[in-house]
């Protein structure tokens, strides 16, 4: 694959000061570096830093994976990659990436926004567009953090209309695909296509793509390069080993991530930030004083289930939180207390939503509540 329109007369250098600079192109693939223009020692450090390993269950490590791409001639790095800190014995230095050329290929579109935005949404759009305008020859993108119900979808559609670039929307659930299609058709005059498994409808203004499909299937990369704007809904999901492959294929000139909770317990949010950018706007959540959170203290005498469980992880005996949570859900006296609380709330005529991370636990609670109803 030819990542660069490389001219042999271009002077691409790697020079040393306190910071070691590496020249690169920024284009549809990311930060592209010709491998014969970077020292092997630096190339090794870059590969090392961009091979990540998720953390799970308080210290246990999962399989590592790469968040860069390379072939015989080029290495492609995340477009928002910050200077890499290297500690080599007693020496410490940074590898910084100098964008020598900025070159994107994409298609333009002419679509209009038909909705009406709230004042705070208009303010966000003005802020984001101004940020893009001032990012000359720099990566353009970032994450917009809004609470659930904050109008992330409508806001993103409005930005797509203003930029006037062929747009790809990435989602990880079928219902989100349907929701985005409905919203795009309701709030703009854009034509809408779908990328999902064998369906590859790209001759449209806005295309909605399933992350599962794009990460697993090698679609025509030249067609994917036509998108000038990529919007990622629930962007925090793209930090995983499988989903992060999507980032290597969809690095457009403009990238916008949307999330109410841009966090990951496995530490892999850094993967998302490297490719999509940092949080560029976040709305502070207003405190709802109508909500009462009440703690219920419970003491269990169940010596079989209510005790610490451990397992071996990398040669160390560590707490097995997964097993302990499973056991908590099986303590009969605890579940009976919950059922009695639900029954008392039911008698007040309230609608009740019960949440649990275990389906088996919900089945136990439902069975107990059903007996009370009968």
Features from the language model and the residues they span:
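Interdomain "pre-motor" coupling segment immediately N-terminal to P-loop NTPase/helicase cores
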Residues: 45-102
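N-terminal pre-P-loop "Q-motif" helix
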Residues: 114-140
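Walker A/P-loop
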Residues: 134-161
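Conserved interdomain hinge at the start of the Helicase C-terminal
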Residues: 160, 315-357, 363-368
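Conserved RecA-like ASCE P-loop NTPase motor core of nucleic-acid helicases/translocases
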Residues: 166-173, 350-358
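Conserved helix-turn-beta segment of the N-terminal RecA-like "Helicase ATP-binding" lobe
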Residues: 175-199, 370-374
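Conserved helix/coil segment N-terminal to the catalytic DExD/H
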Residues: 196-229, 240-245
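Post-DEXD/H (motif II) to motif III coupling segment of the RecA-like Helicase ATP-binding lobe
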Residues: 228-229, 236-299
């Amino acid at each position: 694959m030819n990542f660069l329109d490389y001219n042999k007369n271009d002077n691409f250098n790697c020079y040393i000061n306190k910071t070691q600079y590496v020249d690169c192109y920024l284009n549809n693939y990311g930060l592209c570096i010709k491998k014969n223009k970077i020292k092997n020692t630096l190339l090794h450090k870059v590969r090392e830093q961009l091979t990540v390993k998720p953390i799970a269950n308080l210290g246990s490590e999962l399989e590592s994976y790469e968040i860069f791409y390379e072939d015989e001639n080029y290495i492609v790095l995340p477009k928002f990659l910050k200077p890499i800190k290297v500690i080599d014995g007693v020496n410490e230095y940074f590898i910084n990436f100098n964008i020598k050329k900025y070159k994107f290929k994409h298609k333009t579109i002419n679509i209009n926004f038909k909705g009406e935005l709230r004042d705070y949404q208009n303010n966000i759009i003005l802020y984001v567009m101004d940020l893009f305008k001032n990012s000359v020859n720099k990566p353009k993108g970032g994450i917009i953090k809004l609470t659930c119900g904050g109008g992330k979808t409508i806001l993103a559609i409005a930005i797509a209309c203003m930029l006037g670039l062929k747009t790809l929307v990435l989602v990880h659930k079928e219902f989100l695909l349907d929701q985005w299609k409905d919203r795009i058709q309701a709030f703009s005059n854009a034509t809408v296509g779908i990328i999902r498994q064998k369906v590859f409808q790209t001759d449209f203004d806005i295309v909605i793509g399933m992350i599962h499909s794009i990460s697993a299937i090698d679609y025509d990369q030249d067609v994917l390069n036509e998108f000038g704007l990529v919007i990622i809904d629930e962007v925090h999901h793209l930090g995983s080993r499988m989903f992060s492959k999507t980032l290597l294929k969809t690095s457009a000139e403009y990238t916008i991530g949307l999330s109410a909770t841009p966090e990951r317990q496995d530490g892999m949010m850094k993967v998302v930030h490297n490719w999509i950018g940092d949080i560029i706007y976040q709305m502070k959540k207003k405190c709802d004083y109508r909500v009462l959170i009440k703690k219920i203290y419970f003491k269990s005498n169940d010596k079989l289930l209510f005790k610490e469980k451990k397992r071996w992880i990398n040669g160390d005996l560590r707490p097995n939180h997964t097993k302990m949570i499973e056991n908590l859900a099986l303590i009969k006296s605890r579940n009976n207390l919950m059922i009695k609380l639900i029954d008392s709330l039911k008698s007040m005529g309230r609608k009740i939503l019960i949440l649990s991370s275990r389906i088996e636990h919900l089945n136990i609670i439902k069975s107990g509540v059903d007996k009370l109803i009968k």
